[in-house]
């Protein structure tokens, strides 16, 4: 819901809700008021809540059923959904609810990155999705097939061949899927960075501010590096080895080891490039425009949930305009 609020506060249409995280009971009415195109449910209980909220809002909500079958892959703590073998009964139950209509099926992940060969491969889930969709079509339904996971234009052909009608671009929009880290000829270019500065030094290392130092663990451990710009001067920038606290710890700071002959000082700008997860951090989000034209400009500073961050320097620059 925090992400949905951010989308709506920006004036955008809400395409899909409840897919990764279900809508809490007490927020169902707010969710219905946002009029999402699709709303995913993991259970009949959640379907009933969504339907009732939609009915109170005077509309009929298209629901996607998350389905599963033996052999499917889930991230730990993200299991759930309807048994694909019972998808027809589940769809009938949903269609019987005032305020709801079964619009199709979804899963996650439909594709996963394979570190061994550097490709995005179909999971067993994608086959489950295809089978469930076929069963629904055979019953005379028009079916939407939502198939997210490692989504970028490089995966569209695979997903289309499996019958997908919807994808969730996610990191495809910022060019930060695992494929983009190892392939330099994809249409999308990496367009996200974590920018911070040096706080202090200790024991021969420099400590830069954390808050957004969560690296999505899609690769085996590797030596992280960061670009250090002395005093913000990128013409003099250099790479430094970095150590980031593990996910089990709070990322108060990242640690930088100066290369031989270099010094890292308080206030130096530090830039990391990794697969970010803004919603899972306390870092701010700053969209930049004008990069291709050579006139980059920060459009504002927002918290990860979409609220204006009222960052002092940006507020002062806006006031001077």
Task: Name each region found by the language model.
Residues 14, 102, 198, 240-248:
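A structural signal for short, hydrophobic beta-strand segments that form beta-sheets
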Residues 153-232:
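Active-site loop ensemble at the mouth of alpha/beta enzyme cores that anchors a bound cofactor
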Residues 43, 47, 87, 118, ...:
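Generic structural signal for well-ordered, non-membrane alpha-helical segments
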Residues 205-321:
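C-terminal accessory subdomain/extension
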Residues 1-107, 113-114:
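Active-site-proximal beta-alpha core segment in soluble small-molecule metabolic enzymes
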